[in-house]
Amino acid sequence: MSQVKYNRIILKISGEALAGDKGNGINPTVIGHLANEIKSVHDLGVEIGIVCGGGNMWRGETGAKLGMERAQADYMGMLATIMNGLALQDGLEKVGVPTRMQTSIEMRQIAEPYIRRRALRHLEKGRVVIFGGGTGNPYFSTDTTAALRAAEIGADVILMAKNGVDGIYSADPKTDPSATKFAELTQLDLISKDLKVMDRTASSLSMDTEIPLIVFNVNTPGNIKKVVMGENIGTVIRGDK
């Protein structure tokens, strides 16, 4: 494993990335692509934890704006992340990657409950672990879940896999031709520049734990492997220094 820069990672996959061009739901072709991309990293001996978003199916904030009780809407979002996780688990197992699904809300018929020590043992044995259900608490995003699980398992980095976005820009490059891409930022930069990369709870936790994040385009073949190998793609976000 001397050729890899990061030996244990948290891969945060947005729900939108799982939907692909469809915009919502789960795209089996995308699942297959991601499974092969993750397998290429797993084959290097890297220990991989995965957190899936649920925005391709449901967002708690959206439900709350429509008049639902926020906590109830957030629980629906947690279920969406579990559905995404199960789809990804199926894809990974089809390409021969041993995978375990753990959920913060107990669903013993379909997944293990989240137990930190058990997750660590799975990682040590070369199994990919998918963390579903968010933190298990309403009002917390899956970005916060990624930061939390990264701290709990001692991850070297959080990889923020984005759908068609190859890093962080000063403005939307699709609408502003003068937008510039940042090679490196700090968590304080995200807050001061009001860059909508992750919510402030997730940003604060990442700053406290000093676990770096890398935002990159997951749609480009080989990008996950390139990041793990230390190639300079995407945008690196560090603590407060």
Curated annotation (Swiss-Prot):
GO terms for cellular component: cytoplasm. Pfam families: AA_kinase. It comes from the Bacteria. UMP binds at residues 54, 74, 135-142. Its EC number is 2.7.4.22. Its main location: cytoplasm. SUPFAM superfamilies: Carbamate kinase-like. Pathway: Pyrimidine metabolism; CTP biosynthesis via de novo pathway; UDP from UMP (UMPK route): step 1/1. Allosterically activated by GTP. Inhibited by UTP. ATP binds at residues 12-15, 55, 59, 163, 169, 172. Residues 20-25 are annotated as: Involved in allosteric activation by GTP. Catalyzes the reversible phosphorylation of UMP to UDP. Belongs to the UMP kinase family. Homohexamer. This is Uridylate kinase.
